[in-house]
């Protein structure tokens, strides 16, 4: 079943990319979904599939499993992501809180994804959590430089093999070379980082008191931006499956029933 959506400036590019069967797979994520009520949902779907694709090798190395990776657009404008039941569902904000037509920079969404994957292992924003998050951030950078993905890429690429680096790199803001999605320029905020400009890296020359202050600031920021510490988690999840959205399951044998959830679901396995 197909639904009609608002055509975006990148629709022509998107159709070309689809005809070339550019892979966006991840054997460690069962399904991805985007909000049907928002504009440019095809671009949103391509974006969340790109995120899933890029973390596939990291997830393989760390034995991470995610059942559903979905877009959400919470009422709390500060909220960037949420992990439900250690990977049962990871929800990511893809769009600017003040303009749903604009997508966040890739580095911002990727930072949130790594943060939420860390919640598969650790709940509280404590030292163990941040040690693991920093490890994942550093490892993901190396993986992207080497162009590693845990998926069949076609053209002779094997599971866990390398991809063409030039065709899979993406800029930190602006236009993605894979999807053609126009993303908002400017500074984004990444979960787990002290500054919007980059990954948290504290000078080893700082005093213990300064390091403690940095750590406290990091926890404070993440407690605001991450859904893990929210007292209204059930309400946030409920808002994301409002009856105003329509389910589109990519199986012609299935019928859409009244009252079904609101998300377009794509099987990544």
From Swiss-Prot:
Task: List this protein's GO terms for biological process.
Answer: DNA repair; histone catabolic process; protein sumoylation; protein-DNA covalent cross-linking repair; proteolysis; replication-born double-strand break repair via sister chromatid exchange; translesion synthesis
Per the Swiss-Prot or TrEMBL annotation, the motif SUMO interaction motif 2 (SIM) is positioned at 266-269
**Cofactors, names only:** Zn(2+)
Q: List the disulfide bonds.
A: none
Keyword annotations = DNA damage, Hydrolase, Metal-binding, Metalloprotease, Nucleus, Protease, Zinc
Q: How is its activity regulated?
A: Inactivated by EDTA.
Record's GO cellular component terms: fungal-type vacuole; nuclear envelope; nucleus
Localization (cell): Nucleus
InterPro entries named in the record: WLM_dom (IPR013536), WSS1-like_metalloprotease (IPR053000)
| Motif annotated as SUMO interaction motif 1 (SIM), chain positions | 247-254
Q: Which residues are named in the active-site annotation?
A: 116
User: Which sites bind Zn(2+)?
Assistant: 115, 119, 125
The record's top EC class is hydrolase
Q: How does it assemble?
A: Binds to DNA. Interacts with CDC48 and SMT3. Interacts with PSY2 and TOF1.
Name of the molecule in the record: DNA-dependent metalloprotease WSS1
Task: Give the species.
Answer: Saccharomyces cerevisiae (strain ATCC 204508 / S288c) (Baker's yeast)
């Amino acid at each position: 079943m197909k639904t009609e959506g608002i055509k975006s400036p990148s629709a022509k590019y998107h159709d070309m990319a689809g005809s070339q069967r550019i892979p966006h797979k991840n054997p460690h994520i069962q399904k991805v979904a985007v909000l049907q009520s928002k504009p440019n949902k095809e671009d949103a779907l391509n974006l969340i599939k790109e995120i899933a694709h890029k973390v596939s090798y990291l997830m393989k190395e760390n034995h991470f499993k995610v059942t559903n990776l979905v877009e959400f657009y919470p009422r709390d404008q500060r909220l960037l992501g949420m992990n439900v039941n250690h990977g049962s569902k990871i929800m990511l904000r893809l769009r600017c809180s003040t303009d749903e037509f604009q997508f966040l920079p890739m580095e911002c969404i990727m930072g949130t994804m790594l943060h939420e994957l860390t919640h598969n292992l650790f709940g509280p924003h404590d030292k163990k959590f941040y040690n693991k998050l920093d490890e994942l951030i550093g490892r993901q950078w190396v993986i992207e430089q080497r162009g590693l993905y845990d998926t069949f890429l076609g053209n002779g690429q094997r599971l866990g093999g390398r991809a063409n680096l030039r065709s899979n790199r993406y800029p930190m803001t602006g236009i993605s070379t894979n999807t053609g999605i126009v993303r908002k320029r400017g500074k984004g905020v990444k979960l787990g980082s002290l500054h919007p400009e980059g990954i948290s890296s504290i000078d080893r020359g700082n005093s213990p008191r300064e390091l403690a202050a940095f750590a406290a600031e990091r926890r404070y920021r993440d407690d605001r931006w991450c859904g893990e510490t929210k007292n209204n988690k059930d309400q946030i999840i409920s808002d994301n499956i409002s009856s105003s959205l329509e389910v589109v399951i990519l199986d012609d044998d299935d019928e859409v029933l009244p009252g079904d959830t609101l998300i377009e679901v794509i099987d990544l396995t």
